């Protein structure tokens, strides 16, 4: 078992800017859906949601406003203590994180322009992209002057259980928002298909919003009653 020592300070459960807020949990649903549009282009499967991975992604995202360095928590354990070791992508700023990670493909395209033979390792030479082909292409690019680790993570064929999260904290001066995608293979995975997860989130959001509406209505009725009593008292005073 891992005890994430900084979690209580970094994560502000349910607060507006936190990765655990309802609005940011809902935002992460959109990240997943956008990601799948890219995976569809490569003929790839849609990973299931891991509730464990979602929790890790929330921790990793919120870590970025707690730490004095934008980095993976698993790479800063000597300073901040243990964290989960998994496949992780992090992003910061106003840009959609999925687009940000996928944009690394530009490095491949530019390299192929100068070295046409490299097109055989473009991750697009076969469709659908297979795990064997993906691994072969990854090996080819390992010693090339490209930065594509997030891109290859996004299009990994055998990614089976994932979680996404994001917050709206200030990460660095003039830079807000941190996002994370985590893929895990260790237990407990707590897997659920995306549609079921989305339904759970949206059902909960609906209940909360309905409760907010009821509370607002009650408050309005109370205010109206108070105003009515005040008006009646004013009339009585005027009559006296």
Language model feature labels by segment:
Residues 1-86, 151, 156-168:
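Short, well-ordered surface patches within globular domains
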Residues 59, 73, 77, 121-124, ...:
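Intrinsically disordered, low-complexity segments enriched in Ser/Pro/Gly/Ala and basic residues
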Residues 78-185:
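A well-ordered secondary-structure block
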Residues 197-240:
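Long, non-membrane, amphipathic alpha-helices that form coiled-coils
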